[in-house]
Design a protein with these regions (language model features):
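Chromodomain-type histone methyl-lysine reader module
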Residues: 1-193, 197-202
Length: 202
């Protein structure tokens, strides 16, 4: 799985190093959708970005092909395309992220809880004051692809642009893909027990 992602990313990088990395990032428009990306003069590079994203999702086991149950309504997804620039303002890479159109989800069928606790500003200020008073370091961690570590609790099926499943089949979400209403809640439910039980937080 992860090797497939690494291979796709290496292919993308090879194309970019050769052809795009001397171009200012602002000169390459970000497509609004998959169809526009495939019509773009940079179509092959956006195609590589899509392949890299799909390989990453497969590496995380985000979805799998299943027979659609009666009454199931797959939710549309879209790609969000972005040109990433380096410190010189030149093209670093072309990125595609698959996002669920969560506004199409139905409460009680596709999702239940959506809340996720976050740190209050007052709590953060107390932490900063405590660290300053005791000459401590304060670290902030960003978990890469965090939502993709969290399991989906309800069966949700999606449509992926450019991928047509066999008749009667659909792509079921196994992990909390970006855009789903419950993604933040699922990640919170995943990380808190680990922080307390495995890493010693109270």
């Amino acid at each position: 799985g992860y090797r497939l992602f690494q291979h796709a990313y290496a292919m993308e990088e090879a194309h970019l190093i050769e052809a795009l990395k001397h171009i200012p990032a602002r000169e390459i428009p970000s497509p609004k959708n998959h169809a526009e990306a495939m019509r773009s003069q940079y179509q092959e590079f956006w195609n590589d970005a899509v392949a890299s994203e799909i390989a990453n999702l497969k590496a995380y086991g985000v979805y799998k092909l299943e027979r659609l149950p009666p009454g199931a309504r797959p939710i549309n997804c879209r790609y969000v395309f972005k040109v990433k620039a380096n410190q010189q303002g030149l093209v670093d890479r072309l990125k595609a992220r698959l996002v669920v159109q969560g506004f199409r989800q139905r409460y009680g069928i596709d999702y239940l809880k959506t809340h996720a606790s976050v740190c209050k500003l007052s709590t953060f200020r107390v932490q900063m004051a405590f660290c300053a008073q005791h000459d401590l370091l304060h670290d902030i961690i960003d978990v890469k692809s965090a939502y993709l570590e969290a399991d989906m609790k309800l069966p949700v099926y999606i449509n992926i642009p450019g991928k047509t499943p066999p008749k009667g089949m659909g792509f079921r979400l196994i992990k909390s893909l970006y855009g789903t209403k419950q993604a933040g809640h699922n990640w919170h439910q995943t990380i808190v027990p680990k922080l307390i039980n495995e890493w010693g937080f109270q």
